[in-house]
Swiss-Prot record:
GO biological-process terms attached to the record: bacterial-type flagellum-dependent cell motility
Molecular function as annotated in GO: cytoskeletal motor activity; structural molecule activity
HAMAP family noted in UniProt: FliE
Superkingdom in the source lineage: Bacteria
This protein's UniProt keywords: Bacterial flagellum
Gene transcribed to yield this protein: fliE
Listed InterPro entries: FliE
Protein name: Flagellar hook-basal body complex protein FliE
Localization (cell): Bacterial flagellum basal body
This protein's GO CC annotations: bacterial-type flagellum basal body
Pfam families xref list: FliE
Family statement: Belongs to the FliE family.
Length: 114
């Protein structure tokens, strides 16, 4: 078994094989370019949050009605009332967790040094 010697590496050969670094061009359409676009995205997010909180509020109201109906004897289905209360409890718990995560993220951003 014969071994071939390793050819020496010349710096000029390395430079010929390297491609020059190209300028980074921003990608067109990669995000809102104007304050109007940013305001629209903010409004959409605000609308989304408002709708989500409205759904949580509606579930809480349904649970209140179900528990009141169960207490007064108007609702005979125990499982319907329990399901409504569990939905309301879970949705409120999720809402509180999302709020806590958002506050943690805000505090983390505020701790960043510029």
């Amino acid at each position: 078994m014969a071994f071939n010697p390793i050819a020496p590496v010349h710096p000029l050969m390395l430079q010929q094989n390297l491609n020059p670094i190209q300028e980074n061009n921003p990608v067109e359409g990669s995000g809102p370019q104007t304050p109007a676009g940013a305001a629209k995205v903010g409004a959409d997010f605000g609308q989304f949050l408002q709708e989500a909180l409205q759904k949580v509020d509606n579930l809480q109201k349904e649970a209140d009605v179900a528990s009141l109906g169960l207490a007064t004897g108007q609702i005979q289905d125990l499982h319907t009332a329990v399901i409504a209360m569990e939905k309301a409890g879970l949705s409120l718990s999720l809402t509180v967790d999302v709020r806590n995560r958002a506050l943690d993220a805000y505090h983390e951003i505020m701790r960043m040094q510029i």
